[in-house]
A protein has these predicted regions:
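Bacterial Sec-dependent N-terminal signal peptides
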Residues: 1-19
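Substrate-binding/catalytic groove segments of enzymes
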Residues: 208-214, 225, 242-246
C-alpha cells in the first residue's frame, strides 16, 4: 500500500507545474492528447476522461441479474441494479458529480481532477494522470442492515481514492492502470479491514470512429476472504451524436466502485455473469461564449 501513497505524492508534486501550464496554454504551443476513451467510464471502471468544460453529463448504469438461468428470467433481465449520476466539467481539468445507486441505496459525491495530461509539441509528456475521489453514504433502512448502522451515522460512510494513470498509444489503443484505496467505516467482523487496496487495469481498442472494444480488471493488493472475486468487465462502446452507449458483461452486478471492486461474486465457470449497459447524454451550457471557465 505504501507504493500507492508514494504514487499519489509524486503525482501531486508534478501536477503543480502542470496546472500552472494549463493556465498559460495560450503562451505556448502545447497539443494535449484528446479522447483516449469515448466516455468517462471504460466499462465499470472510471476512465481518464471528464465532461468537457461547461458540459453536464447524465449517465445511467444498468446491470441486470445473472445470466445463468437462461430464458427462465430472460438472462437476468427480470432483475436490475441501477445507478444514476450527473457530472459537470468546470474546465479542462476539473469535474464534480453526484450519484445514486440502488445497491445499498448509496448516494455519493465525487471529484475528478486531471493532475497531468499527455501532450506533445513544446511540452511533451507521455501519460495522463487523473485523481478520482468519492464519498458515499449507505441509506439502507436499519432493518435491512446490521444494527450497527443505527449506532453512529459515520458507520454508513465509504471513501474511495483512486489514481488513473494512462496513455493513448495511437489513434486506436489506450491503456490505463488504477491504484485504488477504499475505506469503509463499518466492518462486520474483526477479520475484515477498514482500508482496502487494489489495482485496476483497463483498456480500449477503437475499431471504427464510433465503435470500440473495452475491458477492465481489478486485483487486490492485500488479503481478502475466500469469497472475494477479482472484478472484471468486457464490452463495447458505440457513440452516436451526444450519446455514448456501452454494453458489457461482468462478474459484478453493482455499478458503484465499492460494489464492483469489493463485492463481485460472479463466476464464469458456473455462468454467473451479469449483462449491463451504460448510457450517457451530454448537455452543453456554453451558449455562444467560446471562452472556457
Amino acid at each position: 500500500m505504501k507504493y500507492i501513497f508514494l504514487a499519489f505524492s509524486i503525482c501531486f508534486s508534478y501536477s503543480q507545474d502542470d496546472l500552472l501550464d494549463i493556465l498559460n496554454d495560450g503562451a505556448v504551443n502545447v497539443e494535449y492528447v484528446q479522447s483516449a476513451f469515448k466516455g468517462t467510464r471504460v466499462a465499470n471502471a472510471q476512465s481518464l476522461e471528464i465532461p468537457a468544460p461547461k458540459v453536464l453529463q447524465f449517465m445511467i448504469q444498468h446491470r441486470f441479474g445473472s445470466i445463468e438461468n437462461g430464458f427462465y428470467d430472460l438472462f437476468g433481465t427480470d432483475y436490475a441494479a441501477i445507478r444514476y449520476d450527473f457530472s459537470y466539467g468546470f474546465n479542462d481539468v476539473f469535474a464534480l458529480g453526484a450519484g445514486r445507486s440502488s445497491f445499498d441505496k448509496v448516494y455519493d459525491i465525487f471529484l475528478k481532477t486531471k493532475l497531468l495530461r499527455q501532450s506533445k509539441g513544446v511540452k511533451n509528456f507521455p501519460i495522463s494522470v487523473v485523481l478520482f475521489n468519492d464519498i458515499g453514504i449507505k441509506t439502507n433502512r436499519k432493518s435491512e442492515q446490521t444494527p450497527a448502522l443505527k449506532e453512529n451515522f459515520s458507520n454508513r460512510l465509504l471513501y474511495i481514492n483512486q489514481l488513473i494513470i494512462g496513455r493513448k498509444f495511437n489513434r486506436n489503443l489506450s491503456l490505463q492502470v488504477l491504484p485504488t484505496v477504499i475505506h469503509r467505516n463499518l466492518v462486520l467482523t474483526p477479520d475484515e479491514k477498514h482500508q482496502l487496496a487494489s489495482l485496476g487495469f483497463a483498456g480500449r481498442y477503437k475499431i471504427t470512429n464510433q465503435f470500440s472494444i473495452n475491458a477492465d480488471y481489478f486485483i487486490p493488493l492485500d488479503n481478502r476472504d475466500s469469497n472475494y472475486k477479482n472484478s472484471f468487465a468486457v464490452g463495447f462502446d458505440y457513440e452516436t451524436g451526444g450519446h455514448v452507449f456501452q454494453v458489457m458483461l461482468s462478474n459484478a452486478q453493482g455499478p458503484y466502485e465499492f460494489t464492483f471492486i469489493e463485492e463481485a461474486n460472479g463466476d464464469p465457470s458456473s455462468g454467473k455473469l451479469y449483462l449491463g449497459f451504460n448510457i450517457s447524454r451530454a448537455f452543453s451550457f456554453k451558449g455562444n461564449d467560446s471562452e472556457t471557465w
